[in-house]
Amino acid sequence: MSENASAWADLTGRTLTKGQGTGNDFIFITDPKAEAVLDADLVARVCDRHFGLGADGFIRAAHTETFSTGQKILEKHPKVTWFMDYRNADGTISEMCGNGVRAFVEYLRTEGLISLEVGEHVSIGTRAGVKTVARTDTGYAVDMGPWSFIHGDAAREGGEDSQVSARGLKTPRPALSISMGNPHTVVMLGSDGKLDGLDLGVAPVITPAPENGTNVEFVVPLELEHEPGDIGVLGEQSEVGAIRLRVHERGVGETLSCGTGACAAAAATRFWGGEDAPDEWLVHVPGGTLAVTFVLGPDDLEHVVLAGGAQMVYTAQLS
């Protein structure tokens, strides 16, 4: 057995599929009973863009009952069949990925593991809870659940809770920490030039440093670009906000897109904008455009709906 085959031994003979959502790309496998041993080194080798298949993350489709988190989900949601077992490119386990869950549902559908027509929805188990995904004419819309301030009232009152230093910025910038089931730190910049001048090949430094790391989003607000109702997620809206976004993902580095990051960035920008800020946002990332909408959820909390496309790219079998 070759050195490379030995390193990938637990995936030998398995079919792997690559998919993407706004350029955020993933490797998928179907492993209903979660039998494959996905240690961090194996996942990192597969996701390596020079010596592996290359991806921002690795996603296993498994039955919900195979995970302890999934078993807890089934106590309240017994019809959640599939669990998105998500790992970052470095092999670390992550709670949630907004682009990943859209691509995951597209993977399940194209593999014949679920049937989902336009207008129908499916519930997916994740480490951040159950996510409801609806198929639309142009892709998928995900109820990402409620967003929250990581540091609570202190962040709400001051509008910031940390400082971020990044290569390309002369001085640290104030930031706001947002949870989308996973941690985010959002920084607003004043111009496209500042955003484009960032070197996100080097991880930004956050003070105080989050115990479990964080995803860092840099945003620039834009003028309104569309007439009311154009993004079509939940009907007409009096106005639509817009931002540009670049992100450094925890355990990955800079990516072309981050779904939970788009939600967190829109939430922070909307909060900074005050009571008159819109509920619908277009988030422009290097890999495309995502629509983010804030709605009242069934639990009477403010939920975030993320909409965008997802496609499968290729399928391969390791030998």
Model-derived features with residue positions:
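Internal active-site segments that recognize and position negatively charged phosphoryl groups
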Residues: 162-196, 202
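C-terminal domain-closing interface element
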Residues: 150, 156-169, 302-319
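Short beta-strand-to-loop element that shapes/binds the nucleotide-sugar donor at the catalytic cleft/hinge
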Residues: 147
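A glycine-rich beta-to-alpha transition motif near the start of alpha/beta enzyme domains, typified by
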Residues: 1-137, 185-319
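Intrinsically disordered, low-complexity regions enriched in acidic/Ser/Thr/Pro/Gln residues
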Residues: 142-144
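Short glycine/proline-enriched coil/turn segments at helix->beta-strand junctions
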Residues: 136-139, 172-174
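Short, conserved active-site entrance elements at the starts or edges of catalytic domains
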Residues: 155-161, 207, 212
